[in-house]
Amino acid sequence: MWGALRSALRPCCRAAVPPQRAYHGDSVARLGTQPDSASSTYQENYEQMKALVSQLHERAQYVRLGGSEKARARHTSRGKLLPRDRIDNLIDPGSPFLEFSQFAGYQLYGDEEVPAGGIITGIGRVSGVECMIVANDATVKGGTYYPVTVKKHVRAQEIALQNRLPCIYLVDSGGANLPRQADTFPDRDHFGRIFYNQAIMSSKNITQIAVVMGSCTAGGAYVPAMADENIIVQKQGTIFLAGPPLVKAATGEEVSAEDLGGADLHCRKSGVTDHYALDDHHALHLTRKVVRSLNYQKKMDVTIEPSEEPLFPADELYGIVGANLKRSFDVREVIARIVDGSRFNEFKALYGDTLVTGFARIFGYPVGIIGNNGVLFSESAKKGAHFVQLCCQRNIPLLFLQNITGFMVGRDYEAEGIAKDGAKMVAAVACAKVPKITVIIGGSYGAGNYGMCGRAYSPRFLYMWPNARISVMGGEQAATVLATVARDQKAREGKQFSSAEEAALKEPIIKRFEEEGNPYYSSARLWDDGIIDPVDTRLVLGLSLSAALNAPIQRTDFGIFRM
């Protein structure tokens, strides 16, 4: 997919390696050192991360099954392909599928399992065009929409809108989950937003294609009705605002689902659908033909260079980072294992050194990287804001590698203006219109999450490693703060606050923060776009950058920076 090129630039070593003379002719230095794989720290990190990755793959495999074995058997007995098989038959042979939010709904509804939130979303290449694919999974609760299903569908549309990706909806759904209608129907970002988004995207020439491969009931009927072009499968796909039971209850009329809203009715009489498919395979073949007719040409605002593999194996990331967030690591070692040729043109290397900034390429795409090497000081924040401005001026996408405890606190730092300096970085990140991608490779705490482009700052994509943690602060810190408040309250009342009382107060707080900071807790609620194996980071970033560059890069306008 991407070409390869090796250069003869001499490596510029760091850290444990003696420094080399800098040559002005070398525009970009090589990063990375060979880790001591025999060290106890490396081996402990490796084993811990390997265990987390094994758990990730095991859970992902279970989610990929979809509904129960009985539900899957019933689905295929009707001549239907399973939703993941539909996607495999839709995308170009041998091309990757960048799936989002695999763990949506994970342990979210108690004993009620909703694998992948009952819907599969991701970017795949169809007839050479990168498309957003949204596929209902009818083996999971009949494909009905839980609150998390709606959220995941709407998030997929948001990604499509931001990156100007044609949308393909593989429809097979019973509509809203009625027992949970209060959390799926009335609010701004509930079920109706799906159709609103379709209308808005169509108005912006972002193609909407619907393939009706099963039930399409009630409000869900608007998915094909509002599509630019649609397809329906005979004796399988149905579209109606009210199904046979509701029609009978409302009017007394008895009618079959096929007669009420089948392929013959909608292709021959109502005109609701455009193409008549004989089965799933035929429908997907027709879909590929529709995409081929879009006359789509991708125009990118960046220069692309031939791709190079990093100089270091990706699995060394396991030994470098590990699961213990209290153990520090140099983010440059992470960068060296994901960027082309391990080349990194560092910016302001000697200033604000707890924030690493610089330019690199990933699969030939230019990227400005911002990575954490400790707490953010005023110098780090000002450096980060400056670098964001450079990337916006040059139309270079931004990659944030988050491992941040937050901004530095204390009287001296407040006096030096940490609040206004941190605000500069937060404002720059908020205003930046270049594509922003965030990977949480360690901790993501407090205002550091904001400065490093957390979810609230609209990164095009946000991924987490399985060792990551996200929270307003660490559990120990939160427990200590609340214990201090309780002790002060007792003191005002003239009472003692015993160590036993303090321990009893702190224990559940620490436990709760640990649970809520877990990446699966985050992913279940769509605070991210997926948990990824560190080894896959480079590929995921390459696919994400490629998708993001379907949209023209807009000019960035910054507001007031308090000096």
Curated annotation (Swiss-Prot):
What Enzyme Commission number(s) appear in the record?
6.4.1.4
Q: Which GO terms describe its cellular component?
A: methylcrotonoyl-CoA carboxylase complex; mitochondrial matrix; mitochondrion
Q: Where is this region: Acyl-CoA binding?
A: 343-372
Localization: Mitochondrion matrix
Q: Which catalytic reaction applies to this protein?
A: 3-methylbut-2-enoyl-CoA + hydrogencarbonate + ATP = 3-methyl-(2E)-glutaconyl-CoA + ADP + phosphate + H(+)
Which keywords fit this entry according to its UniProt record? Acetylation, ATP-binding, Ligase, Mitochondrion, Nucleotide-binding, Transit peptide
Domain spans labelled CoA carboxyltransferase C-terminal: 309-555
Q: What class of enzyme is it?
A: ligase
Stated role = Carboxyltransferase subunit of the 3-methylcrotonyl-CoA carboxylase, an enzyme that catalyzes the conversion of 3-methylcrotonyl-CoA to 3-methylglutaconyl-CoA, a critical step for leucine and isovaleric acid catabolism.
What family does the Swiss-Prot or TrEMBL record give for this protein?
A: Belongs to the AccD/PCCB family.
**Protein name as annotated:** Methylcrotonoyl-CoA carboxylase beta chain, mitochondrial
Species for this entry: Mus musculus
